[in-house]
Regions:
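Signature aromatic-anchored transmembrane alpha helix within multi-pass, membrane-resident enzymes
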Residues: 111-119, 194-201, 310-313, 425-429, ...
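Start-transfer (signal-anchor) and selected internal transmembrane alpha helices
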Residues: 1-31, 79-119, 135, 141-207, ...
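Specific aromatic-rich, kink-prone transmembrane helix
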Residues: 289, 339-365, 390, 537
């Protein structure tokens, strides 16, 4: 950044600087308008920002236009007027705020804010020229990548713009505090966690409310969500660790039982609402180990022990704003409870204990994390390698005690460190083999684990999959070296301004799992649950990369600014930039990625995730209350997926869908012992709209009684005649 970033007072701002600033603001508005027009003129580009319905309204397509029309016209003049007005208002208001905060003249603040801030607006249109150039040069991969990621480019420019404003507005009193010694360290450290508690509390309230509204509105599926609550109910009532989606115990699906630790709470409040509250709380509390690890890494630099608190708090807030983490709370398909989510705070706590070098805490953390899912063992292999080769490269902190030190007695020498790390790696491989090749097949009566079909291109069993990868490396590298892989990485790293890349050894711990996820044919983006283990590794790498990011920014400032600028000014400014860049990058990428209230889809009327469609009053939810009393709790009920959650406390709750189920004799339809059949006709995935379309009632009318409709056709209730 230019030297003007550091000037605190100037009474002789030259007219040339003011004119130059105005020109940059005007140029930024024009170039940004050009880029926005390009994005909005194409349906395929615009839907990275808005819903197809909103795009059709923006370009004013006629009602009868074909739904697959990809081009539309957006007035460049209209965009210039809007962005020009935004530019003028934010330029003038921002300069006023900067002047008040810094104690500088308004003209100086106006010139500096315009020159530096609107450089980011000019960068918006660089995307367009790069995209055009890639097309002309035949770089189809680059062109394709740019076409699916303009939202990340815009988010980066917005984050840079906000970071510039907040850095320029750093008050004189703040700079004075930064220049002091660390005598205020303890009082500041005591205050900072209060803000962290507040941020976590806001997250818990918001996401618990959203999850509960989905439940009340019958928009939460049973499969891969409420089925986990059924596990707890069945265990509590002596039916075994199972869901009646299929016969057999759940260990045939995954070695996953972390949610059983909720049984004491569940016994007091047996409701799925409790599970949603616990999951949101657990995810939010993951911000604390992020804070602790980041602060520890930064505090090792004696130049800024105090500022480590602020940077660590920014990292923790970025974690709460991080879209891939939020998708573990509410997935893109509205699956809201996944035990995998508990692995994020558990693994973060384990890594925190590892950094503190607490042997007992680390071992307990590793053991509990393995209860989340067998996938976490994939991380422990490379983590063992990291311990073996890099684990002792970081100095012991002052809080490390000789009695509890991870390295004391266990890793005092290179050989012992190497053996401990390799032992963890060998254990992880053995555990993964035992889980997938022995335990799970045994609970499946010898059948192959179900997720081998996610890698159907490579084979039908783990042995075939590995064999194909070794014998056909071209197929493997073709799948890995793709636009989808790069986009996946961008979606994980861009929200953190790519700072985790500055800690490559830590980030490499997640590389094998990331490669596996890129081969997954079911989902190749961080909007489901598969990426959960990577979230913890990425924030661990963020903690390790932040000190290097601060140093990198400091060197850039020293190179770009006047030699007379004091080094301590470079230090404080670089820390301020990194502090704001972390959370603004997470916030701005979330505008286009997350479906929370901070995301555009939440407010886009044409979006499937608009707040009124998902969380507002629901006619389906109101009418369902009329039929629930008709079905006794001791009955066996088959139901469609989105009403199934309301029957998990009945004697049996069966899935009614097009899938073949073992409980139904490996055929579609209901099991023979079913007493009631409940069908939801008005969910957007519903295929049956009337009783005449129900195969059981249509083919065997003498066996079923159609109960009177009291729901205006929203639900069909059939009772088996006995």
């Amino acid at each position: 950044m230019p030297a003007t970033l550091h000037r605190t007072r100037s009474t002789n701002t030259s007219p040339t600087r003011l004119v130059s600033s105005a020109v940059v603001v005007l140029l930024g508005a024009l170039l940004a308008s050009s880029g926005v027009q390009t994005w909005l003129s194409s349906r395929s580009l615009a839907t990275n920002f808005v819903s197809p319905t909103a795009w059709r309204q923006l370009v004013r397509l006629p009602v009868g236009a074909m739904p697959n029309v990809d081009q539309g016209e957006v007035s460049f003049g209209s965009i210039v007027l809007v962005l020009g007005a935004v530019s003028i208002v934010t330029w003038l208001a921002g300069a006023y705020w900067i002047a008040r905060r810094r104690g500088s003249s308004y003209s100086e603040s106006l010139a500096t804010w315009g020159l530096v801030g609107w450089g980011w607006w000019c960068l918006i249109d660089v995307w367009e020229w790069t995209w055009i150039g890639a097309g002309l040069l035949g770089a189809t991969s680059l062109s394709g990548l740019l076409a699916v990621s303009p939202q990340l480019w815009l988010a980066g420019c917005l984050a840079g713009w906000l970071t510039t404003l907040l850095t320029l507005a750093r008050s004189g009193s703040s700079r004075a505090v930064l220049a002091k010694d660390s005598s205020l360290d303890e009082s500041q450290a005591a205050r900072t966690p209060r803000w962290l508690w507040l941020a976590c509390g806001v997250y818990i309230v918001v996401f618990t409310t959203l999850n509960w509204r989905l439940y009340f509105n019958l928009l939460m599926p049973h499969g891969d969500s409420v089925m986990y609550e059924e596990h707890l109910w069945n265990v509590l009532h002596g039916k075994g660790f199972r869901s009646y989606l299929d016969q057999g115990l759940f260990f045939g699906e995954h070695i996953q039982f972390v949610h059983l630790f909720l049984l004491p709470l569940y016994a007091c409040w047996p409701s799925h609402l409790l599970l949603e509250l616990c999951e949101s709380t657990a995810l939010a509390l993951g911000a604390f180990p992020v804070y602790w690890m980041t602060r520890r890494c930064l505090s090792r630099d004696s130049r800024f022990p105090l500022q480590a608190d602020t940077l660590a708090l920014a990292a923790a807030v970025a974690y709460l704003l991080y879209a891939p983490m939020q998708f573990l709370d509410i997935e893109i398909d509205l699956k809201t409870f996944r035990p995998e989510a508990f692995g994020i705070p558990l693994l973060l706590l384990t890594l925190d204990q590892l950094e503190r070098r607490h042997l007992v805490g680390t071992l307990i953390g590793l053991a509990i994390t393995l209860t989340v899912k067998e996938d976490y063992a994939i991380l422990f292999g490379p983590l063992g390698v990291w311990i073996a080769w890099s684990g002792s490269s970081e100095p012991v902190t002052a809080t490390t005690s000789a009695r509890s030190s991870f390295l004391a007695g266990l890793l005092p020498r290179d050989l012992n460190r190497f053996l401990a790390g390799m032992a963890l790696s060998v254990f992880s491989v053995a555990y993964l083999w035992l889980a997938t090749r022995v335990v799970m097949p045994w609970f499946r009566s010898g059948a192959e684990v179900h997720y081998t079909r996610y890698f159907a291109k490579f084979g039908e069993s783990p042995e075939q999959i590995v064999g194909t990868m070794l014998s056909n490396p071209g197929l493997l590298f073709g799948e890995l070296c793709s636009t989808a892989t790069v986009l996946y990485a961008l979606l994980l790293l861009a929200p953190l301004a790519f700072i985790p890349l500055l800690s490559p050894a830590r980030l490499a711990v997640g590389l094998p799992l990331f490669g596996i996820l890129c081969l997954n044919e079911l989902a190749k983006d961080p909007r489901h649950q598969f990426h959960a283990p990577l979230v913890a590794v990425i924030f661990w790498a963020l903690a390790g990369g932040l000190p290097r990011a601060v140093e990198l920014v400091r060197k850039l400032l020293a190179r770009w600014t006047a030699a007379s600028t004091a080094n301590d000014e470079h230090d404080s400014t670089s820390r301020t930039i990194c502090t704001h860049l972390i959370w603004t990058a997470s916030l701005c990428t979330g505008l286009f990625l997350t479906i929370s209230p901070l995301g555009c889809p939440f407010w886009d009327v044409g979006s499937n995730w608009h707040w009124q469609k998902l969380y507002g009053p629901s006619r389906r939810g109101e009418l369902f209350a009329r039929i629930l009393p008709l079905i006794p709790r001791d009955s066996r009920v088959a139901s469609t997926d989105f009403v199934h959650p309301r029957f998990t406390h009945h004697e049996r709750s069966y899935d009614y869908s097009g899938y073949r189920r073992k409980v139904a004799g490996d055929r579609t339809g209901v099991p023979d012992d079913t007493d009631f059949l409940v069908i939801d006709t008005n969910h957007r995935y519903s295929e049956i709209k009337s009783a005449a379309e129900v195969p059981e009632y249509r083919d065997h009318p003498a066996d079923w009684e159609l109960l009177p409709d009291e729901t205006d056709g929203y639900f069909i209730v059939l009772k088996r005649r006995r």
